[in-house]
Swiss-Prot record:
It is an enzyme of class 6 (ligase). The lineage of its organism: Bacteria, Pseudomonadati, Pseudomonadota, Alphaproteobacteria, Hyphomicrobiales. It comes from Bartonella tribocorum (strain CIP 105476 / IBS 506). The gene is fhs. Belongs to the formate--tetrahydrofolate ligase family. Pathway: One-carbon metabolism; tetrahydrofolate interconversion. Keywords: ATP-binding, Ligase, Nucleotide-binding, One-carbon metabolism. GO terms for molecular function: ATP binding; formate-tetrahydrofolate ligase activity. ATP binds at residues 66-73. GO terms for biological process: tetrahydrofolate interconversion. This is Formate--tetrahydrofolate ligase.
């Protein structure tokens, strides 16, 4: 019987965080320790690295996720350990898990098996308090908006046009739509508003896109929180809130150093969702790792249609980061599910369903070619995978001109991904990245939306109401037309229908809402039924999480 992830994590032999730091040349005085096994890297030290050459960057992405699981974080960790095993100084850079899905569906997000980040329980829960700081900064701004109106509203804010909600790092559907300031005149002016989850906050996004604290402050100032009665925007700068917000975020902007089970360095920092935000860890963590290592392995959330697309078209576009290679993670089980097999029958050999479902993987491979980046497929191995299924999938991938390598890092750690590591090193040394973004800054916003849908998703285009079209045109006139698009849609399909598996074609994506994130520097396009405040499932993971008789946390996975 296999050990659980948390059992493996609890028996891992951790090294002191100063030892991990020494492996990548960081002296203990440049760390801000949080106990013995985690630390922040000081901003002053990061600044001193500016003249260091950059290492090579590998992005790990995946097919569209299914309940069968793909193992993207596990592969990121296993690949990083494997690269270190073959003598390449490597750092993995990941996002911080959110409490919401931790207690909801996932039960944790630190990798799995013998390819995990530790301390796993701390990482999945409060960690170093970054999310709490972001929540506090976001809600301070919300309080200052209502306070401004209470004390006479000199900015002439229209209470009906306040676009800044409050946030909480929890899945709580009851807070999606609420009325505040009830109870009489001493409590302010009643109005309808709601909560988003913290990882959907624009502050989370802009912190992860900021280059330093000064850049963070400038981005904060640009956030649009409301509109006046004459429909002109009200910003954070108008409320003089950026200083206090930056104070709350001054420690949160510093990346966190932890380790894998094999005692290799990992920077874990920031955590925007990929279905409702841009889905990448912080620019500061990525750039710091590139200055310290030969290779950096990072991931982008959900499938390549969401996380990788935003990594390329938002993160790389804004910061000048250039990836050298991409890994697409797939499992035979998930591809069979894409081919129509019920979740309960995925362990049975089914070549026909695999061939049908592999269309999802093939489309993702072809999409990577649009960005000009070398690509490898990692088949995350399960015991139920038959030899015939493995051969079939490798042949399908070979027809696209790419390789598919079996990876067993979940059960073997880094040595289970050595073949993948060696292939990537060879590929990067042999083939230069010819990276390019999907669309140019100067094309109209509607054209950018349709470009993503037609070129990447395989659809006909977007269904956009006259009201939303008018809003997009207005933003273009106000100077926001050069912003990239951040699509918010279901991660489970190329389409807006989460049940449309495989590689659907000839569909349209309904656009429900658009949001201008002037601080983060992108426009969110909300499609279909996607929610910015999730709810808990029928049987939340929280029901299985508890303390045992030794006060050890159990139930995280």
């Amino acid at each position: 019987m296999h050990k659980t992830d948390i059992e493996i994590a609890h028996t891992a032999k951790k090294q002191h965080i100063t030892e991990i730091a020494q492996k990548i040349g960081i002296a203990h005085e440049n760390l801000i320790p949080y106990g013995h096994d985690k630390a922040k890297i000081s901003s002053s030290y990061i600044k001193s690295l500016n003249n260091n050459p950059d290492g090579k960057l590998i992005l790990v992405t995946a097919i569209n996720p299914t309940p069968a699981g793909e193992g993207k974080t596990t592969t990121t960790v296993g690949l990083s350990d494997a690269l270190n095993l073959i003598g390449k100084k490597t750092i993995a850079t990941l996002r911080e898990p959110s409490l919401g899905p931790c207690f909801g569906v996932k039960g944790g997000a630190a990798g799995g098996g013998y390819a995990q980040v530790i301390p796993m329980d701390d990482l999945n829960l409060h960690f170093t308090g970054d999310f709490h700081a972001i929540t506090a900064a976001h809600n301070l701004l919300a309080a200052m908006i209502d306070n401004h109106i209470y004390w006479g509203n000199p900015l002439n804010i229209d209470p009906r046009r306040i676009v800044w909600k409050r946030v909480l790092d929890m899945n709580d559907r009851a807070l999606r739509d609420i009325v505040i300031s009830l109870g009489g005149i001493t409590n302010g002016f009643p109005r309808q508003t709601g909560f988003d989850i913290t990882v959907a906050s624009e502050i989370m996004a802009l912190l992860c896109l900021s280059e330093n604290l000064e850049n963070l402050t400038q981005r904060l100032k640009k956030i649009i929180v409301a509109y006046r009665h004459d429909k002109t925007p009200v910003t954070v700068a108008d409320l003089n809130a950026e200083g206090a917000m930056a104070v709350l975020l001054k420690d949160a902007i510093q990346p966190n150093l932890v380790q894998t089970i094999e005692n290799n360095p990992v920077l874990v920092h920031g955590g925007p969702f990929a279905n409702i935000a841009h889905g990448c860890n912080s620019v500061i963590a990525t750039k710091t790792a590139l200055k310290l290592a030969d290779y950096v392995v990072t991931e982008a959330g959900f499938g390549a249609d969401l996380g990788a697309e935003k990594f390329f078209n938002i993160k790389c576009r804004q910061t000048g980061i250039v990836p050298n290679a991409t890994v697409i993670v797939a499992t035979i089980r998930a591809l069979k599910m894409n081919g129509g097999v019920d979740k309960n029958n995925l362990t049975e050999e089914n070549i026909t369903a695999l061939e049908k479902g592999a269309a999802n993987l093939v489309r993702h491979i072809k999409n990577m070619a649009l960005y000009g980046i070398p690509c490898v497929v990692a088949i995350n191995h399960f015991d139920s995978d038959s030899d015939a299924e493995i051969r079939t999938l490798q042949k399908i991938v070979a027809t696209t001109g790419h390789k598919a390598l079996i990876c067993k890092h979940w059960e073997q750690g880094g040595k289970g991904a050595v073949a993948l590591a060696q292939e990537l090193v060879t590929l990067i040394e042999k083939q230069d990245s010819d990276f390019k973004v999907l669309y140019q800054d100067d094309i109209p916003l509607v054209q950018k939306i349709n470009c993503i849908i037609t070129k990447l998703y395989g659809g006909r285009g977007a269904i956009i109401s006259a009201t939303i079209l008018k809003q997009l045109e207005s933003w273009e006139k106000e100077g926001f037309g050069t912003y990239p698009i951040c699509m918010a849609k279901t991660p489970y399909s190329f389409s807006a229908d989460p049940k449309q598996y495989g590689a659907p074609v000839d569909f349209e994506i309904p656009v429900r809402e658009v949001r201008l994130c002037a601080g983060a520097g992108f426009i969110v396009v909300i499609c279909g039924d996607v929610m910015t405040m999730p709810g808990l499932p029928h049987y939340p993971a929280a029901e299985k999480i508890h303390l045992d008789e030794n006060d050890q946390i159990q139930g995280l996975s």
